Amino acid sequence: IKLLNASKNFDLLGFLDNDDKRAIEIQQQYNIKRFDDINELSNQINAVIIATPTKSHYSLAKFFLQQKKHVFIEKPITSTIQEAKELTLLANKFGLIGQVGHVERFNSAYSNVKKILNPMFIEAHRLSHYPERGTDVSVVLDLMIHDIDIILSVIDSPIKKVNANGTKVISDNPD
């Protein structure tokens, strides 16, 4: 919100958040309008950022695309490949932009190392504490997607082989 509010490229009209406490804080901190109704919000915008738990990405993005709004979705795009394909088809049908936020591409450490990187072999390990919200989607969609995106942007050839292992330890998805 801070960056959008400061940008000359966007007119930030407001936000919608179901968490009343957080919404009040955002409203006061940034002096922007809080919308309580998704239809009212949709009627006043031409693009939307969806920064919600992954499980709600599909329904929200579908709603806004059907309202002919451009959509930026925090990664991962959806919980399933089928839902992602449906959103892509909808965006194409209406000539809209649908963008997934792969923010690691803009990490200064990555952009600096990319200039000197010439990989022959790439291996990625993701280690971190186990967050409660980590149970809503698999680690592949939540974190490994960053590694895959970075690797795809670094290599200048087709991928020959991918090996991956995952197991359920705490949640219903590979953790």
Where are the regions a protein language model picked out?
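A contiguous active-site-proximal alpha/beta segment in oxidoreductase catalytic domains
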Residues: 78-134
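Conserved acidic residues
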Residues: 13, 46, 120
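Rossmann-like dinucleotide-binding domain that binds NAD(P)(H)
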Residues: 131-175
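Short, well-ordered coil/turn segments that N-cap beta-strands
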Residues: 10, 46, 69, 94-97
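Conserved SAM/SAH-binding loop
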Residues: 37-39, 126, 167
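N-terminal Rossmann-like dinucleotide-binding module
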Residues: 1-30, 151
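Short loop/edge segments at beta-strand edges and connector loops
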Residues: 36, 73, 100-102, 163-166
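Beta-loop-alpha module in the N-terminal Rossmann-like domain of NAD(P)-dependent dehydrogenases
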Residues: 30-88
